[in-house]
């Protein structure tokens, strides 16, 4: 399975930077990176969403606000999709009646030092993260493994760290 880190690295190193928006919009950019990573639907076809609203609502293992993601996982994992949510009621115009909001833009979080890669009117480029006015929501895709970044393992990791600290303290007591 594709890892979040490999997905992010493909976005950074795949030669997309500078491709004009007219050739690769924000949805198309994410789909292209997934396809270039070899990710396909169970029937063998590439993912073909109906815009960033559809991306936020489908094929996720977790979704929520940036703050909820940081609270739940301790960080935004590399390879997560980040979204711009508008509260203009646009989701109803686009056929959604679930109250989640209108997700008007999507990018791929790639981590420091680049932040986010997304396609805007200036083409595919790096964007600042965090940027509370632009990036409001996060989605972890179901076809990507984020566990390489210790996502979902925070409790186990904390217990392991405490155990290691206790072992080191015990050794220190022996020396003293």
Describe each region flagged by the PLM.
Residues 81-83, 108:
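Hydrophobic beta-strand signal
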Residues 116-160:
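Active-site or metal-binding loop neighborhoods of secreted/extracellular toxin and effector enzymes
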Residues 104-110:
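A conserved glycine-rich beta-strand in the N-terminal activation segment of trypsin-fold
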Residues 153-176:
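Short, low-complexity, charged amphipathic interaction modules
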Residues 77-80, 112-114:
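Loop/turn elements at helix/coil->beta-strand transitions in domains of secreted/extracellular proteins
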Residues 90-93, 124-126, 169, 176:
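Short, surface-exposed beta-strand/loop "edge" segments at domain boundaries and coil↔beta transitions
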Residues 1-53, 63, 77, 85-104, ...:
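N-terminal capping segments
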Residues 61-72:
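Short alpha-helix capping/helix-loop boundary micro-motifs
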